[in-house]
């Protein structure tokens, strides 16, 4: 794969308004499609903003009328703001694009980033993003001598069966306390080129998540590097580490088109 270009758009006092970043994404996307620029990762921090993906339900929006920007990515509603490292990888991939493989690569880079700071994270079966797993529950609920197996896959609209395999922790069917998402991922692919990307919680004020159901997932919490490690962690610390792991994972990936299974005649 060709070398990645990283663009640091703005952090801290120079945070980038969401609309400005979205416009820049579309500009770079168009340039990448015609090979005017190489694969590019925009890295930045936003002022506080809620964005809603295409599948967001009205019931998942803030109840107090807080403004929300509707965007053309997958997924549901989320928050971006101070203390969150946001990355928008704009890459040309072989068609038909294997979106799941792209998501897995972003997850891998973020898992490695968290590990470098001493935090173990994981994927969770059926759910995108990077997670801090809840502590094991010693005993599952028992009713009338029968062990109850609450399997969220039976009723969870957000469960994606494509997100599975040995690199995923089993979906939480009550065997763990609440899992906590530390990095959200939402992707759009147009003309074989990716847009949108990830948001890694470094040291945000988590009260912003209280107004919404983050990513439409009701049975999970929100994590950050600072809270999980019990110390202050800054974006300035995390930025070069995340860049390095993104470069390593994305530049060294063996890119393949999505395999389309043929239906028997």
Swiss-Prot record:
Any one Pfam family match given in the protein's UniProt record, by short name: LplA-B_cat
Annotated compartments: Cytoplasm
Annotated site location: Lowers pKa of active site Cys: 181
Recorded metabolic or biological pathway in which this protein acts: Protein modification; protein lipoylation via endogenous pathway; protein N(6)-(lipoyl)lysine from octanoyl-[acyl-carrier-protein]: step 1/2
Family: Belongs to the LipB family.
Functional description taken from the UniProt entry: Catalyzes the transfer of endogenously produced octanoic acid from octanoyl-acyl-carrier-protein onto the lipoyl domains of lipoate-dependent enzymes. Lipoyl-ACP can also act as a substrate although octanoyl-ACP is likely to be the physiological substrate.
Protein name: Octanoyltransferase
Record lineage: Bacteria, Bacillati, Actinomycetota, Actinomycetes, Kitasatosporales
Underlying gene: lipB
